[in-house]
């Protein structure tokens, strides 16, 4: 066991990393969100639909090429904690983690292959 592993294990005991969705302690291999919550995340799949509900929302109001969202936000839903942690609890690393997850799906779908910029809202 390396010093880094011992140090991280000690940190996990003293300051356990908690899943923002279900408040369970994260396993050593989990990053930011536990495996169960990642599996159950209410993904929109808007990136698989041309002129999806989000694009319809912006149509005629804002000049956009495409619009999408990673997961459904519903007030009171435990997944709303992800957004709250980003906005109010200074958790930029959680944002990078979620953005990377969704970016992999977007790249695989080709949905944004002709887009120069993505603006997170």
What are these regions (language model features)?
Residues 1-121:
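Glycine-rich phosphate/pyrophosphate-handling loop used in enzymes and phosphotransfer proteins
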């Amino acid at each position: 066991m390396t010093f880094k592993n011992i140090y991280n294990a000690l940190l996990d005991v003293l300051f356990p990393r908690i899943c923002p969705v279900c408040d369970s302690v994260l396993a050593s291999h989990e990053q930011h969100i536990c495996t169960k919550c990642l599996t159950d995340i209410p993904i929109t799949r808007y990136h698989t639909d041309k002129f999806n509900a989000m694009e319809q929302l912006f149509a005629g109001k804002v000049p956009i090429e495409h619009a999408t969202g990673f997961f459904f936000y519903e007030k009171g839903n435990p997944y709303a904690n992800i957004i709250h942690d980003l906005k109010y609890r200074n958790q930029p690393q959680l944002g990078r983690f979620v953005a990377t997850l969704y970016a992999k799906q977007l790249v695989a779908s080709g949905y944004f292959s002709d887009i120069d910029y993505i603006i997170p809202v």
